[in-house]
Amino acid sequence: MNLLETVEQDTMPTHYKQMTQAEMIARVTEIKDQLGENLFIPCHHYQKDEVVPFADAIGDSLQLAQIAAQNKKAKHIVFCGVHFMAETADMLTTSEQVVTLPDMRAGCSMADMADIHQLTNAWPKLQTLFGDTILPVTYINSTAAIKSFVGEHGGTTVTSSNATKIVSWALEQKERIFFLPDQHLGRNTAFELGIPLEHMAIWNPIKNELEYEGNLDDCKVILWKGYCSVHQHFTVKNIENIRKNHPKMRIIVHPECTHEVVSLADDSGSTKKIVTEINNAAPGTEWAVGTEANLVGRIIQENPDKKIVSLNPFMCPCMTMNRIDLPHLLWTLEAIQNGEQRNQIKVDEQTTKFALKALERMLQLS
């Protein structure tokens, strides 16, 4: 999402913020019933509790991508997530389907850390250093333009759910991979596959240079210097506090956390894995969870028979995810009901052509 898109978005009328929760719930329910199968609302795990009850599907990035690709009925897809997710949905659905983001300010700081101009500047430098031995792999948390570049160069997208499988495949295709934009997911996945940390380099997009002290021939993974602003805030100190004060607690974290945190946790995995593992755990078990606050709160509500806390007691929700709220959802649905188009997410054909190659490779491998 660029600045122009943000400036050009429609502004929600103030009266929506003045409505009561009950009034908004009643209106959203009414419109959903009226539109029926013509409306589909996918919702990411990190969304607010006030939005989640209206979701037709709830999931992580991989689940929502798969669901979007399978849905051919709904004319209107109102995506309760962030910008790159809505872009992915637009590319995976038909040209007749319209994807809408209730608030265009719902971006992703990690996705914004990898700009297409930075990538096109980086690639020739890496080719000079390593020749044609690199396969680009991009986390699904990236812009459509980044996905398109990766697809055009034979690479694939990846999610936290399928990272081990996808990265393993990528390393069979070429001698080394260029993983972007999240260095932590890339590092944790590569390490899990047996690649030592000393064989991983950092690409600094600000300086447009490789940060690596070893022998270039030993470098197997090049990590873009990006990160999740939420998961970066889980620390080794948080884990030490849990071990000291709650020795029976099992610690599970998202692989977007730093390598130090993931290494000290009992387990790590995607939001789907975290939810499934805790839901299936025995009553009375204790958990400290290292992921986004809205999801942790929902896991606590759904598991009253277990003791569950956030690994970081001062953790905030993902603030860009939090921009999707009930007033914006209602505003969007009323526009659809009135035959108006608001905040449509549309990826151009050329970008879609190659981005789809990257997405389809991932979906086939998954």
Swiss-Prot record:
<keyword id="KW-0808">Transferase</keyword>
<feature type="binding site">
    <location>
        <position position="318"/>
    </location>
    <ligand>
        <name>[4Fe-4S] cluster</name>
    </ligand>
</feature>
<feature type="binding site">
    <location>
        <position position="61"/>
    </location>
    <ligand>
        <name>iminosuccinate</name>
    </ligand>
</feature>
<keyword id="KW-0662">Pyridine nucleotide biosynthesis</keyword>
<feature type="binding site">
    <location>
        <begin position="139"/>
        <end position="141"/>
    </location>
    <ligand>
        <name>iminosuccinate</name>
    </ligand>
</feature>
<keyword id="KW-0004">4Fe-4S</keyword>
<comment type="pathway">
    <text>Cofactor biosynthesis; NAD(+) biosynthesis; quinolinate from iminoaspartate: step 1/1.</text>
</comment>
<keyword id="KW-0411">Iron-sulfur</keyword>
<feature type="binding site">
    <location>
        <position position="228"/>
    </location>
    <ligand>
        <name>[4Fe-4S] cluster</name>
    </ligand>
</feature>
<dbReference type="GO" id="GO:0005829">
    <property type="term" value="C:cytosol"/>
</dbReference>
<keyword id="KW-0479">Metal-binding</keyword>
<feature type="binding site">
    <location>
        <begin position="254"/>
        <end position="256"/>
    </location>
    <ligand>
        <name>iminosuccinate</name>
    </ligand>
</feature>
<dbReference type="Pfam" id="PF02445">
    <property type="entry name" value="NadA"/>
</dbReference>
<dbReference type="GO" id="GO:0034628">
    <property type="term" value="P:'de novo' NAD biosynthetic process from L-aspartate"/>
</dbReference>
<feature type="binding site">
    <location>
        <position position="160"/>
    </location>
    <ligand>
        <name>iminosuccinate</name>
    </ligand>
</feature>
<feature type="binding site">
    <location>
        <position position="271"/>
    </location>
    <ligand>
        <name>iminosuccinate</name>
    </ligand>
</feature>
<comment type="function">
    <text>Catalyzes the condensation of iminoaspartate with dihydroxyacetone phosphate to form quinolinate.</text>
</comment>
<dbReference type="GO" id="GO:0046872">
    <property type="term" value="F:metal ion binding"/>
</dbReference>
<dbReference type="InterPro" id="IPR023515">
    <property type="entry name" value="Quinolinate_synth_A_type3"/>
</dbReference>
<protein>
    <recommendedName>
        <fullName>Quinolinate synthase</fullName>
        <ecNumber>2.5.1.72</ecNumber>
    </recommendedName>
</protein>
<feature type="binding site">
    <location>
        <position position="108"/>
    </location>
    <ligand>
        <name>[4Fe-4S] cluster</name>
    </ligand>
</feature>
<dbReference type="InterPro" id="IPR036094">
    <property type="entry name" value="NadA_sf"/>
</dbReference>
<dbReference type="InterPro" id="IPR003473">
    <property type="entry name" value="NadA"/>
</dbReference>
<keyword id="KW-0963">Cytoplasm</keyword>
<dbReference type="GO" id="GO:0051539">
    <property type="term" value="F:4 iron, 4 sulfur cluster binding"/>
</dbReference>
<comment type="similarity">
    <text>Belongs to the quinolinate synthase family. Type 3 subfamily.</text>
</comment>
<dbReference type="GO" id="GO:0008987">
    <property type="term" value="F:quinolinate synthetase A activity"/>
</dbReference>
<keyword id="KW-0408">Iron</keyword>
<feature type="binding site">
    <location>
        <position position="44"/>
    </location>
    <ligand>
        <name>iminosuccinate</name>
    </ligand>
</feature>
